[in-house]
A protein has these predicted regions:
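Beta-rich, blade/repeat-based domains predominating
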Residues: 1, 33-48, 83-103, 137-152, ...
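Blade-level signature of beta-propeller repeat domains, shared across WD40, Kelch, NHL, RCC1
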Residues: 158-164, 176-195
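Short loop/turn segments immediately following beta-strands, especially the blade-tip
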Residues: 16-24, 64-74, 119-126, 167-174
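C-terminal hydrophobic structural anchor segments
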Residues: 117-167
Length: 195
């Protein structure tokens, strides 16, 4: 019923009603982010009850509850959590967010300090709990991809022209390099699918 668009330049998420019969959209709501936070993009949980917005300038993730209303969706911010560790680089920018296949964990990449953060996700409340923020052996991780097995992660390092691979150790709360680094000219985006 609805289409949402993150507008990083004006710190807003625009909500549009989609009329599939007429092929039209109409603006019905605006979700305002904190000023100069830079909402980059967002993810919905598979059950449609929550969505997550990563802010590249403030280095936070906002968690919202979501209900599809008749005319306007009902959204409520339930959490704001940092994407970096305790001592982030001043030039850090939160970049990408991905769920593991069962949505019990979320990952976020941070350019500048060149890290990946992992969160435990409560599937009932949607809330996140930061488990680690670790370096990724590359420069400017513009995107990350989680393998279908949920046990491996790829970091697309835009400025160093590389893709680094890691095994995720959920119990110990860390990632370990796994396999050789691939050289790729300025990688931007990746989606790994099971065939």
């Amino acid at each position: 019923k609805f289409l949402m668009v993150a507008d990083v330049g004006i710190d807003q998420i625009k909500v549009y009603r989609f009329d599939k019969n007429e092929g039209r959209i109409s603006h019905v709501d605006t979700i305002r982010s904190e000023r100069e936070s830079g909402p980059r993009h967002f993810l919905f949980s598979k059950d449609g009850k929550f969505f997550y917005v990563v802010h590249e300038l403030k280095n936070v993730i906002d968690v919202y509850s979501y209900q599809s209303g008749d005319k306007v969706p009902v959204v409520e911010k339930v959490q704001t959590i940092p994407t970096t560790g305790d001592d982030p680089d001043l030039l850090t920018a939160a970049c990408a967010m991905r769920f593991d296949p069962n949505e019990e964990h979320m990952f976020c990449s941070n350019a500048g300090d060149n890290t990946v953060s992992m969160y435990e996700r409560d599937t009932e409340t949607g809330l996140l709990n930061l488990k680690f923020c670790l370096p990724i052996s590359g420069n400017y991780p513009k995107d990350i991809a989680i393998f279908p097995d949920g046990e491996h992660l790829a970091s697309l390092n835009h400025l160093s022209g590389s893709i680094s691979f890691f095994r995720v150790d959920y119990e110990r709360g860390l990632i370990v390099m796994s396999g050789r680094t691939l050289r790729v000219n300025e990688p931007n985006c990746c989606e790994i699918v099971k065939l």
